[in-house]
Every structure is written in structure tokens, then in C-alpha cells.
Amino acid sequence: MIGKRGEAADFAADHPGSNLERVVRAAKVPVLVAARAFRPIASVMLAFDGGASAMKAVDHVASSPVFDGLRIEVAMAAPANREAQVQLEEAILRLRAAGRDARAELLDGSADSALIARIEQQDHDLLVMGAYGHSRIRRLIIGSVTTRMLIDSRRSVLLFR
């Protein structure tokens, strides 16, 4: 578990803490990035892109007793095509096979803005997602959905590599 921002949190609201990305990239276990305010967890949004780290997140949510009795929404921001639908259905089937109360939502728009809007709209308590799936160089040039989600979300985030 780590906080979202360090000692300069009030002065650097547009940046995650300086150690956060380094810790998450090096971690061999999931990392919980705690929100500033405590919020009991009843509803979880799993941000899904079909990648390896997102599949790790699905497997963890399916197998961990921590998620027993919680509502799980698997949300994917992607063009509405057959491939996206199949990937989303596969994730839902895995979760339901493990006894999870899971549903799927295919979202329009850019991943970060569509997912943040969905979290707020559905009032989810926890965001679960894969993290930093691309190289640091690509992140510098294009940006990172993970970083945007950490900055824009007011929820705790459970990250998987």
C-alpha cells in the first residue's frame, strides 16, 4: 500500500508522487494506491484492456476472498467491435465462474476520461487495473492511462503489473 502523493500533495495535485511509478513498476505483487479519504468498498470497477496485466487483475479478483460479496463492473473503453466484445465476455465469464457478481460495460471515448466518468456515474468505491503496460519512453511521448487515472480518480486504485 502506498499513498497517491507524498509530502507535497497539496502543491502538486496534477502529479502522482515521485516514487509511485517506480514502486509500481518494480513491484512483484499488486499495489494498492490509497485515496486521501477512507471509503468502504461495496462496488469495484475493473478497468480492462485485454492486456496481460488486466488479465492478472481479473484472475486476482476472481480468486481473492477480499472480493467476496462485492459488485464488480468490468469496463473497457474501446471501439465497439467483435474483438473487444469477446475479450470483455471472457473476463466476465472468468469472474462469474468464480462466483462473482460481475457485469460488463463497453465505453466510448478515450480510456482515461471514459473510465473516470463511469467511476463517478456508478459511484464505484475501488478501481482495479493493470499498470504501466508500455515503456517509460512511450509514456513520456504519448502519456499514460495509468498516470491519468491516478491523478483524476478520487478512489483507491489497485494496480497490477
Residue ranges, per PLM feature:
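Amphipathic coiled-coil/heptad-repeat helices and related helical stalk/stem segments
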Residues: 16, 57, 111-112, 142
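Glycine/small-residue-rich hydrophobic helix-like segments
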Residues: 68-138
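Short, flexible loop segments at the rims of nucleotide/cofactor-binding pockets, characterized by
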Residues: 9-12, 50, 104-106
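Short, highly charged low-complexity linear segments
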Residues: 60-64, 104-105, 153
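A generic structural micro-environment signature
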Residues: 40, 54, 70-73, 113, ...
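Short acidic/Ser/Thr-enriched loop-to-helix initiation segments
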Residues: 13-29, 34-99
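Gly/Ser-rich helix-loop-strand patches that form or flank binding pockets
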Residues: 1-37, 119-161
